[in-house]
Structure formats: structure tokens, C-alpha cells
């Protein structure tokens, strides 16, 4: 900005720096590679008539992978430092049934059970009262984001026109090799909202 607009105020200066990371899940979970030689989230998260995962053991292994301490790969929930960075996140999943099944599994996981799971996909979890998605997320985060931990599950809601200041990351667990980059970008910018929380300026997002 300074090179092209020297002397002019930078309108983007207050935005947190966007960091984009990718994981090669196909290298770890070979059976979910599709014809484009890319990882297929829709198949990976496929549910049966009882709304449980067809590949439940693999999904459970994936959640364990996210929380596995690995110095080389730096999985996002591998230690307390990372869990504090990703205290409030948005997870994009393929569909409503998949979100319900994942919500149930997260609530049983030894690490993720300490996060409040907010399912805003469709009408949310069956045992939860239907309400405005943004209100549900903000209530779960509460007045002090440092005192809570949340994971918001969505397959489309809250991806345009809203801002949740406490969100620091979005996990894209949907789409495929052929998904347009523009659809990803529109979603990930939800976490680039400027914020000052308990005196700390949000400088990074993921």
C-alpha cells in the first residue's frame, strides 16, 4: 500500500493478517480420494439413515489428528497454546445431516467436549431450540470470549454479511478439487473482522 499510495491512510491497516494453511488429508486417508485425485469431504462425512457417519472410525481418527501433538505438522488443536488461538472457530461442513452427526461426535471427544458446539446448519441439532444463528453463536461466546470456547458448524449460514469478532479461524471441511476459489474466499473473510478483546488487538486470523 505504501508503495502505491504513499502518504494515504491504509484502509486495511486494522484488518488482522490472513494466514491460509492446507493439509493433505489424502496422504493420510487414501480411501477418500475422488476421481480428481483430491480429498472428497462429502464421502468422508457421509451419513446413514440414523444420521451417524458411515465412516465413523475415520472421522473419529480425523478429530484425533486435529488434536495430535506433532511438531512437524502443527495441527490446530494439538496443545493448549493452539487451542487458545483457535478458541472460537467456524467449521464449514458438506450439509445439515453431516453437521448434526459431527456435533454429536465433537461433544463426545475428549478434547472438543470442552468446546461449546453451536450447530447453525439447517435447524441445528434436534434437541436444541431453533433460534437466530448469529444470536446463538454470540450467546455461546458470551461477554468474555477468553472465558469460553466455541465451535460453530455451518453449511452456509453466517458466511455472508455477518461479523463475529471472536472468530479467529475457519476450517473448510467441505467442497472438492472443483470448488471455485471465490466461494472459499467469501467464507474465510468472515474471520478477518477487526477486534480488540480484553485489550488485545486481533492481529492474526486463519
Predicted regions and their residues:
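Short, well-ordered amphipathic alpha-helices
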Residues: 59-77, 100-107, 137-138, 169, ...
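Generic beta-sheet signal
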Residues: 87-91, 149-152
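Interdomain helical connector at the RecA1-RecA2 junction of SF1/SF2 helicase-like NTPases
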Residues: 1-89
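Short, conserved catalytic or adaptor-binding loops enriched in Gly and charged residues
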Residues: 8-13, 108-112, 199-200
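Conserved helicase motor "Helicase C" RecA-like lobe of SF1/SF2 P-loop NTPases
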Residues: 85, 94-121
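Conserved RecA-like P-loop NTPase helicase motor core
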Residues: 116-206
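"Short basic amphipathic alpha-helical interaction patches in structured regions
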Residues: 35-43, 52, 92, 103-107, ...
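N-terminal cationic-hydrophobic initiation segments that often serve targeting/anchoring roles
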Residues: 67, 81, 107, 142-145, ...
